[in-house]
C-alpha cells in the first residue's frame, strides 16, 4: 500500500529530474499497455460474433458423437446377428473354463496334506476374466438394442422401439440379473483375495468356497444360453451354416458335459479324502486339522493317514469300519489327485466322465454316502438325456446332407412304379431314366424356378441377369442389343435340359418357343413339306438358336403360332435358355429397339430358315447360269457348223468330206452333253424353280429404326 501512494506523490514532483525520468518510462509503458488492451478488447468483441457459431458447431459435434455412441441397434441387423452367434459360442466355451477352478486343490504327496496349485489358479483367473469381458460387452449391447413392441407386431415386422428408457427397463426386468450373476468375478475374488487373507487353512477354504461359487454361477450361465439360442434362431433362422458344423456343436456339448462331470468327480474325490483324514485325526490325540492342510508348522501325516485311510477297492471291503470311497476310489488309486501335471489329470477325469456318461452310470458302484448317490443319479439321468439329444441331433444334421439324394431316390422309385403301371415300352423308360439322371447331374435336385419365384422381383431380376447375361452375349444376335433389352430377355428366360436324341420341335408342328443353345450339339433338318427330292440339314452348336419367332412377334397382326418348317433333334446333351412366344411378343411390343433394321438383318444372317432359302436360291441361280452357259456353247458350235457348211458349198469334194466328219462329231458330242445334263437335272434338281422354298416372311413396319 506504500508504493501506490509514493507513485502518486512522485508524479506531481517535476523538479527531480532523475526520479522523473524513472517515473515517466513506466507511464509510457502503461499507456502502451492500455492501448494494446483496447485493441485486444476490440478484436475480442469482433471475435464474439463468430464465437456462438463455433460453440454451436462444437455442441453439434459432441451431440453427433453421443448419438453415435448411444445409437440404438436393430435386433435384425446383420452385425448384431453375427455378434449373437459369436457370443453364443463363447458362452458355451465359457462353461468349459469354470471347471478349471476345481483342479486347483491337490494332495501334496510329500506330506499327505491338501494344497493349492498357484500356477493353475492364475491361468483359470485369466481365462475367466477374458470371458467375462465379452459378457460385459454383451450387456452393453443389450442396453442399446431396440425391440419390437408387441402391439405393432400384428402385420410385418412391427415397429422398432428406440427409446433408451424403455430398452433399459425391458432389459432390467428380463435377463439383467442373470447376466449380472454370470459375470460377477466371485471365483477370482475367492482365489486371489479371500483365501490368502483367511486365518483358517487356505486349501480348506478354497475347496469349500469354489465348490459352491462355481455351482451357483454355473446355473445362470446355463440358463442364459437357451434364450440366446432362441434369439439367434429367431433372427437368422439357424446357428450353424452347415450340417457338419451343427453335428460338431452337438458333439462338443456332449464332451463339455463329460468335462464338467469329470472335474466334479476330481473335486469330490479330494473332499472324500479330506473327510477320511478328519475322521482319522479326530480319533488321534494331539492331532490338529492344520496338519492336514500343509500348514508351515505342520508335521508329516503319512505315518497315521496311510493306516487310517487305506485305498481299498469297494468290492473288497468287508469291514464297515473301513472308509468306503465308492466311485472316487479310482481317482485316489490312479494318483491324479496328487499330480500337478494338469494335462494328465484333465484327460483322465475327462475320460472318466465320458465313459460313465455314455454308459449311463451303470458301472458306478457307490457307497452309502448320500452325496455320492445323488451324484451318480445325476450322471445317469444326464447321460440318458444328453445321449438321446446327441443321437437325435446328429442324425438330423447328417440326414440333412443327404436329403436331396433321398428325394431323388423316392422320385425314381415313383417313376419306376408309374412306368410299370402304365406299361411303357423299354425305349421310353430308358429315355425317362436318362433325362432324370441328366437333370440331377445339372441341378443336384434343386428346383431353380420354384426357388426364384419365391424371391422379390428386383432380386430375381438381378439373379437372372447374373446367370444369363454372359451366356446370352455369346449368341451373336444378342451382342447388338442394348442392356435394357437384354435385361427384359433375361427376366423371361427359362433354363431347359434335353437328353441325347430328343426332339425339340418337329416339322409341321406349331412353334411355341425359341431355344438359345448354351451347350451341346443339335441337327436341324427339313424336307420342305415332305416333297420328293428335297432335303436340307444344318448343325447347330453353342451360340445358335432355333425356333424363328421374331418375325411372328414383330407382326402386330399375328395371332396363331407359326408352323415349323424344320425338325430339330439333339445329338448330345443340350442345355439352353427357352423364351416362350408370349414373352417374346411382350418384349417386341414393349421395346421398339427390337424393330431396328440392324437386328433384323442380323436375324436373317443367323436364321436357319433364311440360310436354307439363301442356299436354295443360290443353287437355283447357279443352275440357271449353267444352262445358259451350255446353251451359249451350243449356239457357238451351231454357228461354227453353219459356217463350215457354207464353206463346203463353195469348196470341192475334199472339203465336203471334212465338213461331214466335223458335223458328225459335233452332233454326237452335243447329243451326249444334252443327255448327260438332262439325266443330272432330272435326278439331282428336278424342277428346281418350282421346288425353291418360300422366302421367309419379313414384315416391314412403317416406323422402323435405323
From Swiss-Prot:
The keyword Disulfide bond does not apply. Residues 107-119, 196-208, 269-371 are extracellular. GO terms for cellular component: plasma membrane. Residues 611-640 form the IQ domain. SMART domains: cNMP. Residues 1-85, 141-174, 230-247, 393-706 are cytoplasmic. A nucleoside 3',5'-cyclic phosphate binds at residues 477-600. It is found in: Cell membrane. Residues 591-606 are annotated as: Calmodulin-binding. Keywords: Calmodulin-binding, cAMP, cAMP-binding, Cell membrane, cGMP, cGMP-binding, Ion channel, Ion transport, Ligand-gated ion channel, Membrane, Nucleotide-binding, Transmembrane, Transmembrane helix, Transport. It holds the Pfam family Ion_trans. Probable cyclic nucleotide-gated ion channel. Homotetramer or heterotetramer. The binding of calmodulin to the C-terminus might interfere with cyclic nucleotide binding and thus channel activation. This is Probable cyclic nucleotide-gated ion channel 3. It comes from Arabidopsis thaliana. The gene is CNGC3.
